[in-house]
Amino acid sequence: DVESRGLGDVYKRQDKYWEFKGNPDYGMKINILPDGCTDFIFTLGEVADIAEQESLIMQPYRSYFVGPMSRYSTLITYAKSIHMFGIRFLPCGLFRFMQLPLEELGNQRISTFESGGIFNDSLAERLCEQPYIQDKIRLIESFLTQALCTNNKIEKQISYAVDCINLSKGQLPIRSLVENVCLCQRHFERKFK
């Protein structure tokens, strides 16, 4: 059925769900490694703030998009209790869900209201009402599946290229990749952005 096919496509594109919840020490630093992945973060209570002064300050009960990270980042806790929940997508895993070019969003944190993505602040509020992590995951997956059904524009060559990259764990030379997807390198680069 459509839902099971949709979830299979969702699972291929996401890396993991994660939750940061607890009572950290005041001023505790959390280092974030650059991994090229993108995240949606739902603040389900107080949050850890970004150390960089020019960055967006995240507010409780909101949702945020974090673009592909290519440099280290640090979060600092200033609250007694923290609760953040997120979904991490593999590189290029969002091309079916967002209309913005991800290359322009590298190393940025923006409100999902500004990103035009599939999630919004009302989802963060609904996630707060879910008592268990599995319930939160089910709610997010229903949003993702619905988005796949409404945005059925599939770039088969790009989807195939992403699968090849993931299968080779990023070790496939570009020349081999463009030959596999039957595109010239320049056209491939334009489509991939």
Locations of regions flagged by a protein language model:
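Single conserved hydrophobic/aromatic residue that forms the stacking wall/gate
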Residues: 1-11
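Short acidic-glycine-tyrosine-enriched beta hairpin
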Residues: 54-65
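Compact structured core domains
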Residues: 72-172, 181
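Short proline/glycine- and basic residue-enriched helix-capping loop/turn segments at helix->loop/beta transitions
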Residues: 14
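Basic/polar phosphate-binding segments, predominantly the helix-turn-helix DNA-binding elements
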Residues: 171, 175-193
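Conserved short histidine dyad/triad with adjacent acidic residue
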Residues: 18-31, 66-72
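Glycine- and acidic-residue-biased ligand/ion/polar-headgroup-sensing regions
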Residues: 35-49, 91
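A short beta-loop-beta micro-motif enriched in histidine and acidic residues
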Residues: 27-38, 80-82
